[in-house]
């Protein structure tokens, strides 16, 4: 249902025609900017409450004065409305909602769902079918867990492309960290049992798992299966050793602790996580607020949004009561398919965890405010130097990286007044240009980034930095002009004398040059953005170059065509396996004779190449 009045929006009339069903409502400004998303147990009553009487604070007054239209979505329950509200806030970023700003995806342990499951670190969208365990507050925790999984349960970690094409076990098998399912060195039922036990461990059931292994060990011993009993004994010993090292508190087996600190219209939510009694560390979040949101409102919004994307533990400790706690608890329990308890009045060890989280949240917020203050000062200095009337809300910077024209990559990094916005960084693999032509590379990258913005009505930067001189800047100008992009201030960042930091020249689109000097906060801001663009570009370039060089090693060998190349890679499970093989092993591949095997071996190891005379034509 949607109403767009010609003049002032009549909120009372709109609310009067709504049903009393639960649902989600959205408020829009006259230019269709989304102002606010909210949920309601009864739409008519909740929406009507905004327009009956005087708004209770300045934020509401400002928001309601801009409303030009509203629309609603009816849901089956208030819990369903809560979930939809969180999805819309995350995807649409309404101006007046508290929203979780999380530029990095959390790492998880992924256990795939296939005949021979693999276990691996995973970030990003859950495109792979399987169980996701986490989230972990850092990669270190995931790697420690994976190391334990390989040691205890010997599950494979290799990609499917390698797994399907191996003809002999890899190094992981040789050092006892994989059971070798790729070459049938473990029976399917035994591997499935290892997967089941690994799942129990990851679910926090290590005590139950230990009892089960002990029972199986006793059964094997009674059946005189001494080798199996010995393996189970070693597994149990490793499991107990791990538990003794890593348990912090047996009563904190599966627990998240959340504390919220507020100061100067800023907020910090600190998350302390325990899984299976292990302290996984802390992570800090700085939600976008409107300055008048209370700490309990901020924390409530965080709980709803964060656990809409991450699996909640069975117990979540909060440093304060949050609005609609029972509803949120019910929604989380439904989504997680297990009971989730929100608690704030706790004693003993749990009270200690809350105190620890609260102190850390306060300290982290003070540190962040100090850092933000300096960052905002540099951003304001940039505005003044460039003569802009409005604050600089978004800066983008492009850089090009290649090795003598090879594997050219362009980077685009994004900063706002608070610092880098890493979730919006982009890389562009450049193709179809003369190798080493930085001008063409820059133009292609600019065209690709801004064409998409034009087609999708995407956000544009206030300032666009180009790492380069007048030539690079001219290419960016031409690309933007072709696309009809206006109101973006272009600035070229040219190397200074002897390429020394602090001596950079800033080239404006009208040809002027600015040399603010090393002490300028504005130049320090530009240097920070430029250096980040350079880092991001060169990292992408090195990865692309390495991949290309690894692939091309076989292509450079006379006598190796597409068919033989595919046979070699399939037989050895990839270039790494082929490089580890000797000449005799290579010669056993169909279509490869001894002479060709010698040439392949020499090429891969940087040795003098034997004469290619007498070899068959490439296949």
UniProtKB/Swiss-Prot annotation:
What Gene Ontology cellular-component terms does the record carry? cytoplasm; excinuclease repair complex
> Cross-referenced Pfam families, in alphabetical order?
GIY-YIG (PF01541), HHH_5 (PF14520), UVR (PF02151), UvrC_RNaseH (PF22920), UvrC_RNaseH_dom (PF08459)
Q: Where in the cell is it found?
A: Cytoplasm
Positions of the UVR domain: 207-242
Alphabetic keyword roster: Cytoplasm, DNA damage, DNA excision, DNA repair, Excision nuclease, SOS response
Answer whether the UniProt record assigns the keyword DNA repair to this protein. Answer: yes
Instruction: List S-S links within the chain.
Output: none
**Domain GIY-YIG: from-to ranges:** 20-98
Tell me which domain of life the UniProt entry assigns to the organism this sequence originates from. Bacteria
Could you provide one GO biological process annotation from this protein's UniProt record?
A: nucleotide-excision repair
- Molecular functions per Gene Ontology: DNA binding; excinuclease ABC activity
Query: Oligomeric state and partners?
Result: Interacts with UvrB in an incision complex.
Give the family from UniProt: Belongs to the UvrC family.
Record-linked HAMAP family: UvrC (MF_00203)
Q: Which NCBIfam families match?
A: uvrC (TIGR00194)
Function, as annotated: The UvrABC repair system catalyzes the recognition and processing of DNA lesions. UvrC both incises the 5' and 3' sides of the lesion. The N-terminal half is responsible for the 3' incision and the C-terminal half is responsible for the 5' incision.
Q: What's the protein called, per UniProt? A: UvrABC system protein C
The organism encoding this protein is Xanthomonas euvesicatoria pv. vesicatoria (strain 85-10)
Q: The organism's lineage?
A: Bacteria, Pseudomonadati, Pseudomonadota, Gammaproteobacteria, Lysobacterales
Per the record, the gene is: uvrC
């Amino acid at each position: 249902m949607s109403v767009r009045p010609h003049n002032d929006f009549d909120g009372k009339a709109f609310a009067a025609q709504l049903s009393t069903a639960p649902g989600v409502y959205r408020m829009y400004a006259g230019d269709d900017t989304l102002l606010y998303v909210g949920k309601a147990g009864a739409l008519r009553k909740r929406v009507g409450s905004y327009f009956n009487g005087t708004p209770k604070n300045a934020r509401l007054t400002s928001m309601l004065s801009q409303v030009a239209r509203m629309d609603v979505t009816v849901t089956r329950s208030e819990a369903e409305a809560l979930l939809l509200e969180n999805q819309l806030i995350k995807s649409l970023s309404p101006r007046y909602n508290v929203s979780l700003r999380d530029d990095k995806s959390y790492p998880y342990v992924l256990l795939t769902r296939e005949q021979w499951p693999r276990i691996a670190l995973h970030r990003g969208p859950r495109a792979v079918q399987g169980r996701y365990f986490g989230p972990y507050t850092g990669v270190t925790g995931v790697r420690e867990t994976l190391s334990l999984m390989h040691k205890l349960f010997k599950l494979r970690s290799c990609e499917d492309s390698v797994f399907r094409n191996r003809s002999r076990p890899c190094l992981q098998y040789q050092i006892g960290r994989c059971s070798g399912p790729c070459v049938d060195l473990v029976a399917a039922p035994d591997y499935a049992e290892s997967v089941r036990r690994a799942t129990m461990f990851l679910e926090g059931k290590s005590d139950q798992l230990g009892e089960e292994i002990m029972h199986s060990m006793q059964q094997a011993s009674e059946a005189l299966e001494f080798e199996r009993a010995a393996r189970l004994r070693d597994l149990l010993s490793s499991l107990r050793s791990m538990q003794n090292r890593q348990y912090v508190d047996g009563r904190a087996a599966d627990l998240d602790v959340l504390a919220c600190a507020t100061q100067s219209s800023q907020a910090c939510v600190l998350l302390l996580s325990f899984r299976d009694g292990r302290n996984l560390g802390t992570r800090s979040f700085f939600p976008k607020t409107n300055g008048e949101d209370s700490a309990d409102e901020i924390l409530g919004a965080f709980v709803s949004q964060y656990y809409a994307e991450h699996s909640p533990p069975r117990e979540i400790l909060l440093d304060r009561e949050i609005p609609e706690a029972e509803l949120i608890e019910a929604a989380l329990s439904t989504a997680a398919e297990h009971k989730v308890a929100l608690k704030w009045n706790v004693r003993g060890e749990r009270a200690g965890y809350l105190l620890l989280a609260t102190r850390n949240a306060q300290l982290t917020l003070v540190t962040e405010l100090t850092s933000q203050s300096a960052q905002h000062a540099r951003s304001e200095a940039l505005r003044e130097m460039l003569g802009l009337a409005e604050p600089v809300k978004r800066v983008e910077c492009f850089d090009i990286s290649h090795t003598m024209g090879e594997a050219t990559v362009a980077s685009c990094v994004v900063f706002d007044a608070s610092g880098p916005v890493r979730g919006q960084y982009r890389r562009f693999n450049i193709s179809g240009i003369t190798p080493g032509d930085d001008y063409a590379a820059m133009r292609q990258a600019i065209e690709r980034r801004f064409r998409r913005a034009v087609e999708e009505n995407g956000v544009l930067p206030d300032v666009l930095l180009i790492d380069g001189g007048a030539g690079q800047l001219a290419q960016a100008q031409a690309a933007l002009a072709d696309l009809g992009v206006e109101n973006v201030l272009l600035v070229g960042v040219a190397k200074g004398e002897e390429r020394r930091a602090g001596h950079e020249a800033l080239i404006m689109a009208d040809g002027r040059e600015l040399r603010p000097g090393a002490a300028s906060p504005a130049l320090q801001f530009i240097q920070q953005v430029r250096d980040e663009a350079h880092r991001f570009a060169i990292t992408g370039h090195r990865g692309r170059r390495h991949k290309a060089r690894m692939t091309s090693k076989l292509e450079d060998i006379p006598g190796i065509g597409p068919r033989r190349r595919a046979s070699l890679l399939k037989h050895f499970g990839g270039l790494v396996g082929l490089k580890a093989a000797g000449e005799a092993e290579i010669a056993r591949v169909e279509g490869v004779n001894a002479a060709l095997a010698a040439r392949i071996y020499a090429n891969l190891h940087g040795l003098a190449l034997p004469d290619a005379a007498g070899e068959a034509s490439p296949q």
